[in-house]
Amino acid sequence: MGRMLVELGNITEREHNQNVRSSSKAGKSSFAYAWSLDSSEEERARGVTIDVAHDTFRTKHTLFHLLDAPGHKDFVPNMISGAAQADAGLLVVDSITGEFEAGYSPQGQTREHATLLRSLGLQQ
């Protein structure tokens, strides 16, 4: 979500560069885009989204309210509170070999999130 917000101009180049510097200094350079929405010290230290983050962006014809919800199993209640506010969902999945498959296993987090989204009425 952070990369999309940077590309759309919602996160300025200056803000993004600050996230790049800060994440590199913390030894988490690959988290620079995530830090666009994960702004608390705890989220940044742990490397996971904990609370639902909000942002807004506009296209030519539509105003979007973005809710970035946690994906970690410890924060499923927070994910549910974010998803319950949504009209549509975008489930971002890990594409690393092994991680992707684990997410869709019977006890996988991706499978659980997809099931929760459907049970909350998100059809798209």
What is the predicted role of each segment?
Residues 1-77, 86-99:
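P-loop NTPase switch module centered on the Walker A-proximal segment
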Residues 82-83, 89-124:
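Conserved C-terminal guanine-recognition region of P-loop GTPase G domains, centered on the G4
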